Amino acid sequence: MGLQFILGDATTDHAGTMATMVQANLQADSQNQIFYLVPNHIKFEAEVDLLKRLRAQAASVNGVYAQNRVQVLSFSRLAWYFLKNTALYQQPRLDRASNTMLVAKILGESKEELTIYAGEAHNTGFVTQLADQLSELVTGRITAEDLNTTVAALTPGDRHRAKLRDLGIILDHYEAEIGPYATNASLLSGLQQVMRNQDLSHTFIYLNDFNVFSASETGLVETMIETAAEVTVSLVLDKPYPAAPPVAPNLFLPAGRLYHRLYQKAKTMKVPIRLDRFAKPRPLSEGMKHLADWWQTSTNLQPQAPAQTAQNKEVELAVATDPYHELRTVARQIYQAVRQGARYRDFLILARRLDPYAAVIPAIFEEFNIPQFTDLERPMKDHPLVVLIESLFAIQDHDYQYQDVMRLLHTELLLPENMDIAAFRDALDTTDNHLVRTGITGKKRWTQTDPWRYFQRNPNADDSQLDPEADKTAQINAIKTLVADTVPQLLRQWQTAKTGREAAASLYQWLQTTGVIDQLNVWRQTANADGDLSRSQANEQAWDTFTQLLNDYATILGEADFNRDQFRELLAAGFASATYTQIPSTLDSVVISETGLVRLAKAKHVYVIGATNTAMPDVPNDSGVLNSEERQLLAAQLPDDRFLPEQGPTTTLGDPFINYLGFMAASEKLTLSYPMQNTQENSENQASPYFRQLAQALQLTPATWAPAGLGTSLKAVLGSQRAMLSDFVRAAGEAQHQKLPLSRSWQGVLASLKQTTLAPLAQKLAGSLTYQNDPGRLDPTLAVQLYGRDMNVSVSRLETYYRNQFEYFLKYGLLLQPRPEFELSPADTGSLFHAVLDQYLTQLRDAGQTLADVTAADVAAAVPPLVAAITKRPGYEILGSTHRMAYLTSRLSRLLIQVLTNMRQQQRRTGFRPMRTELQFGRIGDTRGLPGLSWPLPHGGRVNVRGKIDRLDVYRESDAQRFMVVDYKSTQHRFDDSDAYYGIALQMLTYVEAMANVPADPPFVPAGALYFHLQDPKFKFSTDLDLDIDRLKAFKYLGFLVAKDGADLAAVDKTISAETGGRSMMVPLGFKKDGAFNYNQSNILTPEDLSAYLLHNQALIIDAASRILAGDIALAPFQYGQESTVISNSDYQSIMLFDPATGFDHYNHVPKLKRKEVLGRVTTDPTQIPHHRQEDSQA
């Protein structure tokens, strides 16, 4: 037995020296066995490297070399090698996920004994942290008794007592619970026992690339030293420290402390200690040698030699604008180097923390076609299988809440039979919209036997439905059936399960019978077929983790009474700590890692990115369960063979060493960079002290890494075709912004790219530079396909066209609709008002009555039952969804009573009576009403206009039936002549024309078109307040009346007349004392005026239909003055992206006209369409 140290700083070749010793051992005796131990994450690389070196030394023929007496292993694989046939190794493994589950169980069961940790069993984040801490304590060989001894040594009032006491209780239970399991600590302990009982006289053990050991690993190494023929430990260390450990500041502090500990232990065990050997120098560039010297003298605070500029070419510093362009520049340089003969494996990219770069790494390296392996653990908690299981518990907890059910379905692991994934996604989107618009929730609704019906809530009153109901009804019922046939079955089994094993088995069987396991296999096979091994293994590992957790649960709590909440918490805790194991997709790839992970020093060029003052040196993390102060308290009570890793401020002493190893992993060149912008916190970064000191000591001027621009030479940004396209777009965009010509070289880049497979993308991106927000025109043939040769339209559609042609195309051509939401909207209340008013007035008409014939009490009694009946119809679910909505429904009922009561008052003052309500003309959906309006179009086809009149009031005379069109509005409306002239208010004139065209005897003669405001008016209190009169004024009809003189309107308001004069409180009508109309109080059109308006209205309808079928879809929203409501109130802003500030987008800017001007235009030529003038860029 014996102990041999191999020393040398990072400029030496430790692996080469050890390979020589290994070869000598192999040649010395054919019985000699070699165990070469390295950290687990570099085992494969180390094995390949050692075998290559042994082959070179053996000078094998044909380059073939085989060796069965050399084992390159990690500590865990060494345990497997010696223990694989023992009972200990056959015990179930307690990995991180199952360990977390076990700790969650212990916390739940021991909460009565605890004080500060009593309520933490449900906190999965803390449980994961506590599980790691307990594992660390066991690996540190620290027992519950050690914690209790520490507690006893503290003063009664010490603030650490309660925490350490709780931890001691938990650790005591933990030690008892882990007995049946194989843990890392128990395997290392078992390995020690086996090695003590085996003949290792021909066993030579080499340890390389370790700078620190845990207490369990230290104990194992000490056993090796005591039992093996020889143990050789290689340390990155400049000199031995036999008598005392190094004292800070010292670059080699961690390795020096390890040397001292092992040396003293060997001395205590009376094991021979060989003379230290020093590794030979490895091939390094002069710049890397100089860097090593500077790093050592700088850290050790020693005087430094003057810098030699010539020596520093191999060390570069750079400042990037942001993390994205920092990493992109690195990728570009690697791409260019490989084109000059380098290999991808020659490059290593390191960061102290990779988090700021994690999201952009895949995209950047894919853009440059560079294979890369990111050596970073990825958490498993977001895998669809984990989400599906979490959703099942949530569905049961929240009674089939919308978010939980949709989260389960969006995993795409639970699919209906005989439905492909595309059809499923479409059906799921439809169901999603249906649930949002109807508010369906709860097990009762999901499992009801009656099928759901898809419908559009409160469609436009005069418009047909846009959604194909039958197809969508089939889709939503396919999803409903999927949930109803699968989820309740499992939840019932959990409710009736007696033991934990029953519940675990039911979950596994459910996943099997519902096809979840099959779908996971499909994913894995698809990933394999695509060559995506990482994705394939992720699915496999997620399933393996899940089955292991189920097995652990069955082992730990299988026979106990089933507790569903505990089952959920244990699975959640297990998944929270689970991570994916990753493998490189190819041997020749760029490795991306963190400086805290040991790497073999085999790269030629190392890039260290993210060198900011918060990363280098690293900010100490003292957030564990045991902080640095508590660790020191504990260490004071422990013997030397029991200890925990350092944490907190003391770790900064080893930070220079960690970075030194990372920097010196390069043999030829080091590039150190940092981004000026912290994109995660939207702040500015400062350079690391290492960066600043290097710049000063080596007289280096940092390069600037910025995005490609006009001034960037083409040679500097040469990259893959896709990367060059990105750079071209940026450079060309800069040229356009600065109004400068684009250089010929950049123009040549685009020309070259258009000859490659990227041509379509290049053309598209290049076109974006000159893009103007102009939708152009539709081909007329396509327009006819969209809308039909014979256009069947509603008035509101045509008004939309005149407000914004492009919005019309989006809404009625592409049928785009905003996502409906489950909320009480004006459309809901308006729809309810219309329905109640229609039903009540129809009931009165059928009974031969009018509102004037009933009492206020009759109205108050009739409305609530009507409201109750209507709110039970499909589409009104929201009004009964909550107590608040029920209250709002009662308020709406009271408002309707008030509205009808005031209509009653109005009808007592007028001779007009409601003849019909909800009177339809033209075809709406599958129903027909009065004849619609129809006109031929200039280029063939017809335009057919449909609509629905809210109420038609009629006064019968001997030679005419005078009618007034009444339209209910939720906001106050007036008839605006200018709006009517420009086509944005076609409704009233169209309704008047539809009624005037109805054949009747005597004929229908228009008397007016009025708006009725459905409102809940409020009045200021005053002593002379007369509510009846004030309400009458508040509910006054607004619009226009038609008459030659006052006699035509005698029946409109019988309380006034041309003879007596006065002003109406219910319609826009007033008379002067001489009997003439008072136009300040009246809104009167003569029959001749109305005829001109109707002819113009007809011309507008024909013009709109013609332009729609001609493909006119200009993005030129209608505007008076500086109004922007057409855009600001639109549901399609995010599609239109209309912005006049760009100089490209323009309004259809028109002057606001008064009636006199409108009449002058329409009487001159009613068919003349208003000239649409676009504002200039200055308007």
From Swiss-Prot:
Domain of life of the native organism: Bacteria
The keyword Amino-acid biosynthesis appears for this protein: no
EC code(s) of this entry: 3.1.-.-
Keywords: ATP-binding, DNA damage, DNA repair, DNA-binding, Exonuclease, Helicase, Hydrolase, Nuclease, Nucleotide-binding
Top enzyme category: hydrolase
GO biological process: double-strand break repair via homologous recombination
GO molecular function, one term: helicase activity
Cofactor list: Mg(2+)
Keyword ATP-binding: yes
Role of this protein: The heterodimer acts as both an ATP-dependent DNA helicase and an ATP-dependent, dual-direction single-stranded exonuclease. Recognizes the chi site generating a DNA molecule suitable for the initiation of homologous recombination. This subunit has 5' -> 3' nuclease activity but not helicase activity.
Miscellaneous notes: Despite having helicase-like domains, this subunit does not have helicase activity.
Family membership: Belongs to the helicase family. AddB/RexB type 2 subfamily.
Quaternary structure note: Heterodimer of AddA and RexB.
Full protein name: ATP-dependent helicase/deoxyribonuclease subunit B
